[in-house]
């Protein structure tokens, strides 16, 4: 007789006669959802991708369990979805459009850099790219302009002619890491609190200069939302973390993304609603970049951009042509659809 295992993260059918002490790989903890990140309280892995969260492998081995487990008490620490619901005041009435307009912060507030979360699949793709081709290889010197800067992170060399190729390039082949205020490069691990000191860190590898010119690219992009979150997605192959930045204020978004091949996507968006900058973040994956903006007030946005900004862009003939908002009401829209990403992340 085949029974269904109710251990979290398992869900397999098993034969009680062959149920061994190490037959089941599961999560003994509870789901944790905090600042758009999803994970289990029993292990450290976190992701913004809902289907990747569902596929996080169990961290504990034991026998299968055919009985439904009682609900465990919520752990202290990061807020879970249940605890957030408990804290929500009863009968909360959404603010009217007039109230939101009146309470909208001034647009001249300085933007802040959003933290970049680099997926394991992208790290593997960047490592493979580093093995396949050295920076600057195959670039036609006749196309390089005098005064061009080396594009490798950590190198400040300027092209003065063919003799510049003979000088060594000291650079960082890895990606920048920002965690709990500390800043470092994944390739050398020297940590610092000061952003200026981080930028001035000398490279840890010697190679060839990359004089490639970055080209503005027209990338496919769209957005979707839940009651508490707006996700802007820009599609492109192999975003380069060292050159990417996304800034946001409560009402504006500034995007600068560099993909493989020196293709650059840039956009400035005056947001329809107000966001919580401190809780927002950016996730880099092999085939796209997801910008997760946490709404300051729950509710649905009629569109991504503010009507005033759309009117101004319409007059000037310039606009950010976002694909239609796709999501309805679930974080399922954050799921990965590319089979190659799933294979790389395993």
Swiss-Prot record:
Q: Which residues bind Zn(2+) 3?
A: 150, 155, 169, 209
**Which residues of this UniProt protein bind Zn(2+) 4?**
172, 187-188, 204
> Entry's Gene3D superfamilies?
2.60.40.790, 4.10.1130.20
Q: Which residues form the CHORD domain?
A: 5-64, 150-209
Q: Where is this region: Disordered?
A: 70-113, 311-346
Against InterPro entries, the record matches this protein to: CHORD_dom, CHRD1, CS_dom, HSP20-like_chaperone
Residue ranges of the motif SH3-binding: 28-31, 70-78, 173-176
| Entry GO MF terms | SH3 domain binding; zinc ion binding
Which residues does the record give as Zn(2+) 2 binding sites? 27, 42-43, 59
**CDD domains listed in its UniProt record:** p23_melusin_like
Every copy of the CS domain together lies at 216-305
In this chain, composition skew of type Basic and acidic residues spans 98-109
One GO term under biological process is: centrosome duplication
**Record's GO cellular component, any one?**
Z disc
What residues does Zn(2+) 1 bind to? 5, 10, 24, 64
Q: Where is this motif: SH2-binding?
A: 159-162, 235-238
Q: Where is the composition biased (Polar residues)?
A: 79-94
Q: Which UniProt keywords apply?
A: Metal-binding, Repeat, SH3-binding, Zinc
- Cite the record's Acidic residues compositional bias ranges: 321-346
Lineage, top-rank taxon, reads Eukaryota
This chain's function reads: May play a role during maturation and/or organization of muscles cells.
The annotated subunit structure for this chain is:
Interacts with beta-1 integrin subunit. This interaction is regulated by divalent cations, and it occurs only in absence of calcium.
The text the record gives for the protein's domains is: The tail domain binds to the cytoplasmic domain of both integrin beta-1a and beta-1d isoforms. The presence of Ca(2+) ions does not prevent binding of a fragment consisting of the second cysteine rich repeat and the tail domain but prevents the binding of the full-length protein.
Q: What is this protein called?
A: Integrin beta-1-binding protein 2
Query: Which organism was this protein described from?
Result: Sus scrofa
């Amino acid at each position: 007789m085949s029974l269904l295992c109710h251990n979290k993260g398992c869900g397999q059918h098993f034969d009680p006669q062959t149920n061994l002490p190490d037959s089941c790989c599961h999560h003994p903890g509870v789901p944790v959802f905090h600042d758009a990140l999803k994970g289990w309280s029993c292990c450290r892995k976190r992701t913004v991708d809902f289907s990747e969260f569902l596929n996080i492998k169990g961290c504990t081995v034991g026998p299968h369990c055919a009985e439904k487990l009682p609900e465990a008490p919520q752990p202290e620490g990061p807020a879970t979805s249940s605890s957030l619901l408990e804290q929500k005041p009863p009968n909360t009435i959404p603010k009217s459009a007039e109230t939101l307009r009146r309470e909208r912060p001034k647009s001249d507030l300085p933007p802040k850099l959003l933290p970049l979360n680099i997926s394991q699949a992208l790290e593997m793709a960047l490592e493979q790219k580093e093995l396949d081709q050295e920076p600057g290889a195959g670039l036609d010197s006749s196309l390089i302009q005098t005064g061009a800067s080396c594009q490798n992170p950590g190198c400040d060399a300027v092209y003065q002619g063919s003799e510049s190729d003979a000088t060594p390039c000291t650079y960082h082949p890895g990606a920048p890491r920002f965690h709990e205020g500390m800043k470092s490069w994944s390739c050398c691990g020297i940590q610092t609190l000061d952003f200026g000191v981080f930028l001035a860190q000398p490279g840890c590898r010697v190679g060839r200069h990359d004089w490639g010119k970055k080209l503005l690219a027209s990338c496919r992009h769209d957005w979707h939302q839940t009651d508490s979150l707006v996700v802007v997605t820009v599609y492109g192959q192999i975003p380069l973390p060292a050159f990417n930045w996304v800034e946001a204020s409560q009402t504006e978004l500034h995007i600068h993304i560099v993909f493989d091949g020196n293709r650059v996507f840039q956009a400035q968006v005056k947001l329809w609603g107000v966001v919580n900058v401190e809780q927002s973040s950016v996730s880099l994956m092999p085939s796209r970049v997801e910008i997760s903006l946490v709404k300051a007030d729950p509710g649905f946005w009629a569109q991504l951009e503010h009507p005033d900004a759309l009117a101004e862009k319409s007059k000037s003939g310039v606009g950010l042509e976002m694909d239609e908002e796709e999501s309805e009401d679930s974080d399922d829209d954050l799921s990965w659809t590319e089979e190659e990403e799933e294979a790389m992340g395993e």
